[in-house]
Amino acid sequence: MITIITQDQLKTSPSVREDGRAFDELRPLKIEAGILERADGSSYLEFGGNKILVAVYGPREAQIRKLQRPDRAVIRCRYNMAPFSVEERKRPGPDRRSVEISKITAEALRPALILEKFPRSVIDVFIEVLEAEGGTRCAGITAASVALADAGIPMRDMVVACAAGKVGDQVVLDLSEEEDKEGQADVPVAILPRTREITLLQSDGNLTPEEFERALDLAVEGCLRIHEVQKEALRKRYGE
């Protein structure tokens, strides 16, 4: 017997979303490490319709004096959406959102890095969104962590990010672009998976305390699943 699920059922079922996923299901994910020869570290990530390339350069001596810290390195992140990454072609160059996400990304990654080993140095992380389909800030953080590990930067742990949110009064994991547009709330989270220390936590929208707790638990669980893909990418890269 073949069961046919209609579009109306997809929209109203608590366990099936418009793209066919369960409420606690991630989009398909692929990560590769070390794909750029001239970067010190690099990664490529596909997460649903997102395609993101990350290059890491450094640590290297900070040429600008105001960037120098006598006791540690400085991490700089540049998040950029390519003009062709979205349906409505965007203007080249950083906009307000890109600047904000660049800052948030650096803050999320910093706790994992042993920066005191490289005083007066800078580590540059370039995140290029080639195609965007919702959740690019979390995907960028996840890919950047792999690229930093590929660069050999000493790390206390990886950083992995994922979001949960509320769509149609249902708390769901890993919002797609359409769900993000139509949804009632979004909770991006980044953690150090070994200790589950939170390095990024944002909340946009309306959630009850119980819904927020559920969203946070779902996002952390999503992070732990994504971390397995991070580890596999590095194992393939280094044959371990």
Swiss-Prot record:
This is Exosome complex component Rrp41. Belongs to the RNase PH family. Rrp41 subfamily. The lineage of its organism: Archaea, Methanobacteriati, Methanobacteriota, Methanomada group, Methanobacteria. GO terms for molecular function: 3'-5'-RNA exonuclease activity; RNA binding. The keyword Magnesium does not apply. It comes from Methanothermobacter thermautotrophicus (strain ATCC 29096 / DSM 1053 / JCM 10044 / NBRC 100330 / Delta H) (Methanobacterium thermoautotrophicum). It is found in: Cytoplasm. Signal peptide: none annotated. GO terms for cellular component: cytoplasmic exosome (RNase complex). GO terms for biological process: gene expression; rRNA catabolic process.
